[in-house]
Amino acid sequence: MSEPGKRQRFSPYKSHRNYRTIRGTDAGLTLRHFDRSRRKYRLFGKLSDDAVAYLLMGISGVICVVLLLCLANCVSGCIHGCTRQDTTSSQTNELDSRVEAQTSQNLTRQFTDVLNYADNITWIAAHAHSYRDERLPELALREQEAAPFVRSILDSSITAPASDISPEQGSMPTCYTWDGLWGSTSYGQGTIATDGSGLVSWYMIRAMLLGDGSQTPVDFAEQAHEYADDTCGTRGEFFTQHAKEAGLSIKEYSVSLDNLKLSCDGDKKLALVCLKEGATSPYQHWAVVARVNKNSTVSLYDPASKKATDATWEQNQLVDKISKLYTVSALS
């Protein structure tokens, strides 16, 4: 402390003092000086520069090999794909060109049936409103085999499939209302295809019991014109009144399981039945029960439904679907 009243004296500035202070020598300290040029951060640790160079060259080589392999694989795939496409395109399925070549014959035929149906039903759907009788497109929807016939009603470029029937006594032919031989013939409120189940059933019965196919459903349509109705399509009186003329004997029975068995027992008698609405189709119609099989099932020949004809029927299952029952045999 300076004495009061006396002017404080300042020593001259000594630059070397400030330097020592900065260096820390005034306080007796010795600072460590880092050489920043020596602080190098190395990616590969203590490896030498030559080792690092060799390592980078190795990695680059591996990457090049991988890229070359990928490129070769892509080129090979493209060549193989083009070759396969050319080979496939040069081959066609002999049975149906719409099905891939080398497909088995059995599978090809199955595809053909479905593809043909798809083609027909698509055409029918596009012209559905043009049909005067809505039951015709309904028939095509319900029965796949009927689609070509239904289409042929409006499409003149299509010929409806027709059966080649050679009636033989003792052999029951399988016939349907939509057959090209008679399906489009006018009958009742529509055609034989929609209303002629009784006429086709009568034809099958005569073919089975008499071996006679001289008269077809077209002929019966003229004979039964007065008997057409909106229930089963044909009234039962047509059969009872024309049986003798046709060389047949017919008798009506009440519907029961016993009477059904009796009506189609053996090869000499057949049962002519009217099936109820909704039994095998949305409408009442006629069908034929041919025989009782060994396993107690019965054979149904339904001219309005291939699905029903192909099915196996238990007797008690079928009898519940019958509204009228006639026994028919050859006139002795």
Feature names for model-found ranges:
Residues 1-47:
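N-terminal targeting leaders characterized by basic, low-complexity, disordered sequences
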Residues 6, 25, 29, 46, ...:
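Intrinsically disordered, low-complexity regions
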Residues 16-19, 25, 129, 155, ...:
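A generic structural signal for solvent-exposed, polar alpha-helical segments
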Residues 45-47, 51, 55-61, 68-228:
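Active-site-adjacent structural segments surrounding the nucleophilic cysteine of cysteine proteases
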